[in-house]
């Protein structure tokens, strides 16, 4: 594997601490790409287990699997799925870049804590979706799509019957009627998933302009005759 002789940046990833979090900020295939650009990748042992990546996968890709203390001490930049706690921020050396979903839209105090600690925050949620060159890094689209898909699957699992129409010798079961509130990224994915599962889908959004998107997926738009787009 062709690599630069000297690494210019050390990028580190720690175990996520949020309960039930199974994602990891760096996967082995991205490690390979970063190594080709001369980036040293440090992974805390076990960081990828919940995402079905073992330490050996990272080692084979060119990462160094080390302790959490090692990652914190050596990294120039740290990647996170969920933002690190204030206690963890206090352990990170000044000048380190903190990259992830930092909740910057709703928590000014947390942003201030990053600044107070002498760190550089890179809030992925503020990445402009309109930039075509940055769309592959748009966490809002990718993660909200996952949430919408999962929501439809969880609902289907919790429902006490079938979603599609089923006709057998014993009779006919009518398809389930599903109402989805919100036709943003997550809502549209939920609509598409529920339709593919065979449900009759109706969706609502406060934006009248979303009607076309809803109907393009084969769902019915619930029109309440109200326009909230102007506040």
Predicted regions and their residues:
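Glycine/serine-rich phosphate-binding loop and adjoining beta1-alpha1 elements at the start
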Residues: 2-10, 15-16, 84-177
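Short acidic-hydrophobic, aromatic-tinged amphipathic segments that line or gate anion-handling sites
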Residues: 64-68, 122, 221-224
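Short, hinge-like loop/turn segments at secondary-structure boundaries
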Residues: 58-62, 139-142, 218-223
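Short, basic, helix/turn surface patches
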Residues: 66-77, 145-158, 227-231
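An N-terminal-biased, well-structured beta-alpha scaffold segment characteristic
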Residues: 2-113, 117
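Glycine-rich phosphate/diphosphate-binding loop of Rossmann-like nucleotide-binding domains
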Residues: 14-49, 162-231
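Short, acidic/turn-prone active-site loops that include or flank metal/cofactor-
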Residues: 70, 103-106, 126-128, 207, ...
């Amino acid at each position: 594997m062709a690599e630069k002789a000297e690494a210019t940046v050390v990028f580190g990833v720690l175990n996520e601490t949020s309960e039930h979090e199974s994602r990891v900020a760096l996967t082995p295939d991205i490690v390979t790409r970063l190594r080709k650009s001369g980036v040293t990748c440090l992974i805390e042992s076990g960081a990828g287990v919940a995402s079905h990546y073992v330490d050996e996968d990272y080692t084979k890709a060119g990462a160094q699997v080390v302790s959490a203390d090692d990652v914190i001490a050596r990294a120039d930049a740290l990647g996170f799925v969920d933002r690190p706690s204030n206690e963890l921020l206090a352990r990170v050396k000044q000048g380190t870049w903190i990259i992830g979903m930092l909740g910057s839209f709703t928590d000014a105090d947390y942003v201030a804590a990053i600044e107070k600690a002498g760190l550089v925050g890179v809030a992925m949620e503020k990445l402009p979706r309109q930039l075509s060159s940055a769309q592959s890094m748009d966490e809002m689209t990718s993660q909200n799509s996952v949430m919408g898909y999962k929501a439809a699957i969880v609902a289907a699992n919790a429902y006490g019957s079938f979603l599609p129409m089923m006709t057998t010798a014993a009779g006919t079961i009518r398809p389930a009627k599903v109402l989805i509130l919100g036709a943003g990224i997550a809502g549209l994915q939920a609509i598409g998933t529920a339709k593919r599962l065979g449900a009759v889908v109706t969706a609502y959004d406060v934006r009248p302009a979303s009607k076309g998107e809803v109907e393009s997926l084969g769902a019915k738009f619930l029109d309440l005759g109200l326009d909230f787009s102007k506040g």
